[in-house]
């Protein structure tokens, strides 16, 4: 059976200096390669909706990005506005400080409230593994399962490292079949697959 990798790719542009033309180019590439979604900041959702209207490409928006340190109410507001403007999926950033403080109720509530605000839309949580210990990664994955999210992701791309084989194996062991796993992978890191 042939696996179409392109349908698993969120073609992403989250740089603060991204221009309208950059977003147009991103959407054109996503259509050309039939990617799953474009992942953009919420200010670009309406433009992407217009550009992608005759395609099978969806729109992912980030909330609490890139730090995850904002109030849950802010993430909920961002989520509602993103969906109102036409986004299909939400990538929320984990409240890393709360996880490190072992304030698991806050972390769980943060995820649950975003999921609730997203209604039936897919919600992924970005863990930022390079800032977490092994035990923190495990706990974050367990909380994501408990919150009813669909995916856990490795990183924002705004910190010191993205996906690595060790973390991906750990995350997949924890979430097993309960959640899906998304990796932040730069093109040259695709060579990691040879290590599986």
UniProtKB/Swiss-Prot annotation:
The entry's keywords: Cytoplasm, Lyase, Schiff base
User: What catalytic activity does the UniProt entry give for this protein?
Assistant: 2-deoxy-D-ribose 5-phosphate = D-glyceraldehyde 3-phosphate + acetaldehyde
Keyword Cytoplasm annotated: yes
State the compartments where it is located.
Cytoplasm
Q: Which domain of life is it from?
A: Bacteria
Q: Would you tell me the Gene Ontology cellular component terms?
A: cytoplasm
What are its GO biological-process terms?
2-deoxyribose 1-phosphate catabolic process; carbohydrate catabolic process; deoxyribonucleotide catabolic process
Give the record's pathway. Answer: Carbohydrate degradation; 2-deoxy-D-ribose 1-phosphate degradation; D-glyceraldehyde 3-phosphate and acetaldehyde from 2-deoxy-alpha-D-ribose 1-phosphate: step 2/2
Q: What is its EC number?
A: 4.1.2.4
The molecular function GO annotations come to:
deoxyribose-phosphate aldolase activity
InterPro entries in alphabetical order: Aldolase_TIM, DeoC, DeoC/FbaB/LacD_aldolase, DeoC_typeI
Keyword Lyase part of the UniProt annotation: yes
* Encoding gene per record: deoC
The active site annotation covers 91, 153, 182
The Swiss-Prot or TrEMBL record describes its family as follows:
Belongs to the DeoC/FbaB aldolase family. DeoC type 1 subfamily.
The region annotated as signal peptide is none
Where is it mostly found? cytoplasm
Q: Matching PANTHER family, A to Z?
A: DEOXYRIBOSE-PHOSPHATE ALDOLASE
What is the purpose of this protein? Catalyzes a reversible aldol reaction between acetaldehyde and D-glyceraldehyde 3-phosphate to generate 2-deoxy-D-ribose 5-phosphate.
Q: What is this protein called?
A: Deoxyribose-phosphate aldolase
